[in-house]
């Protein structure tokens, strides 16, 4: 009798697994579609502003100031790299970072504010599905903006692609890292003003001090050593290495740093969801 009951229980569990997988896939795809449609629906807020901002950066720093600076480094092909060529990868990465972060922080906090996040929490979807859906939506916006800024940069300078895998993987890792950070910000935020605190006082300074506009190797000590504590430095330089073949730091070490951030932040976000921090009232 016990054998029959055990066998029946096993059959029920085996039959339930495909249903759970299907539920997870449906939930994940639904969140991703919702986030993508949101970005496209309000494109004048999500796509146009960063495009205008980066165009101004290219004009002011690249054309007006960059023409007076001259050569910044020597490329992988032995050709000199002008200032506008040097900052172009950093500006692309800056747009990816800011938009990946901003998308998920505002979207998930909106879900909290409108209280429909509670419906997701009581659904059969596990926490990682909710997190993956919102992160994928943020990465999608980062991809859209990054491609647009890349296209705009072609009006001001030529863009190389020396290491396609390095370029794409760095883009994805950076977008995921700052999407996870934006998720944490949305979790702890209690009002809409809290969403702007981290980008204003943390994200913007780290971005400007992350080697976007200058070569970190040229900094005097101890500022050069202090700059290596900035995680954005590793993303910007690895992305620059993928496009231009030059970097201030070892790309292998940069990958270690970025992967460590993805694992640590991902685990922390899932833990926050399971504990219901900032989600359950």
What are these regions (language model features)?
Residues 61-70, 98, 153-161, 189-191, ...:
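Short helix-capping/hinge motifs at transmembrane helix termini and TM-loop junctions
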